[in-house]
Amino acid sequence: MLLLLLLLLLGPGSCLSEATRRSHVYKRGLLELAGTLDCVGPRSPMAYMNYGCYCGLGGHGEPRDAIDWCCYYHDCCYSQAQDAGCSPKLYRYPWKCMDHRILCGPAENKCQELLCRCDETLAYCLADTEYHLKYLFFPSVLCEKDSPKCN
């Protein structure tokens, strides 16, 4: 049973066909962040739902590995967007997936541009990482209280 769960989490994990991933126009809210990850990444977006100290909702402590650092920087990017008056978890923006590349826009405003760049950066960052099963479902109680400062 655990093996089946891991295969679902780490496999292609998408209901989108290859043709759809290559040339589909998306608009996103928080739930559609998975689409940008699916466009670029070698893993299912579900593989990051509860990984390390930062992948998933919230986050604190020292990031555990390169994947966790990607999620940490994404949290920082969302914080900066929020400071600029955007609502990262609710705001929608247009983008395309073409040949496993994210194409942001055309943006109607600065928030759309900022949020697409946050998600694009995360997707490319995660695509270049090695996955460590030991950080999947990592207990948050093992994450330190203090977090690094966002730049």
UniProtKB/Swiss-Prot annotation:
EC number(s) reported in the record: 3.1.1.4
Pfam families: Phospholip_A2_1
Gene Ontology CC terms: acrosomal vesicle; extracellular region; extracellular space; lysosome
GO annotation terms (biological process): arachidonate secretion; axon guidance; cellular response to leukemia inhibitory factor; cholesterol homeostasis; defense response to virus; erythrocyte maturation; fertilization; hair follicle morphogenesis
Subcellular location: Secreted; Lysosome; Cytoplasmic vesicle, Secretory vesicle, Acrosome
Residues the record marks as active site: 74, 119
Cofactor(s) annotated in UniProt: Ca(2+)
Paired cysteines (S-S): 39-97, 53-143, 55-71, 70-125, 76-150, 77-118, 86-111, 104-116
Entry-linked InterPro entries: PLipase_A2, PLipase_A2_Asp_AS, PLipase_A2_dom, PLipase_A2_dom_sf, PLipase_A2_His_AS
Positions of the propeptide removed during maturation: 18-28
GO terms of molecular function: 1-alkyl-2-acetylglycerophosphocholine esterase activity; calcium ion binding; calcium-dependent phospholipase A2 activity; phospholipase A2 activity; phospholipase activity; phospholipid binding
Keyword terms: Calcium, Cleavage on pair of basic residues, Cytoplasmic vesicle, Disulfide bond, Hydrolase, Lipid metabolism, Lysosome, Metal-binding, Phospholipid metabolism, Secreted, Signal
Known catalytic reactions: a 1,2-diacyl-sn-glycero-3-phosphocholine + H2O = a 1-acyl-sn-glycero-3-phosphocholine + a fatty acid + H(+); 1-hexadecanoyl-2-(9Z-octadecenoyl)-sn-glycero-3-phosphocholine + H2O = 1-hexadecanoyl-sn-glycero-3-phosphocholine + (9Z)-octadecenoate + H(+); 1-octadecanoyl-2-(5Z,8Z,11Z,14Z-eicosatetraenoyl)-sn-glycero-3-phosphocholine + H2O = 1-octadecanoyl-sn-glycero-3-phosphocholine + (5Z,8Z,11Z,14Z)-eicosatetraenoate + H(+); 1,2-dihexadecanoyl-sn-glycero-3-phosphocholine + H2O = 1-hexadecanoyl-sn-glycero-3-phosphocholine + hexadecanoate + H(+)
Signal peptide: 1-17
Protein residues bound to Ca(2+): 54, 56, 58, 75
Cofactor binding note from Swiss-Prot or TrEMBL: Binds 1 Ca(2+) ion per subunit.
Functional description taken from the UniProt entry: Secretory calcium-dependent phospholipase A2 that primarily targets extracellular phospholipids. Hydrolyzes the ester bond of the fatty acyl group attached at sn-2 position of phospholipids with preference for phosphatidylcholines and phosphatidylglycerols over phosphatidylethanolamines. Preferentially releases sn-2 omega-6 and omega-3 polyunsaturated fatty acyl (PUFA) chains over saturated fatty acyls. Contributes to phospholipid remodeling of very low-density lipoprotein (VLDL), low-density lipoprotein (LDL) and high-density lipoprotein (HDL) particles.
Oligomer status and interactors: Interacts with PLA2R1; this interaction mediates PLA2G10 clearance and inactivation.
Family (UniProt): Belongs to the phospholipase A2 family.
Protein name from the UniProt record: Group 10 secretory phospholipase A2
Gene behind the chain: Pla2g10
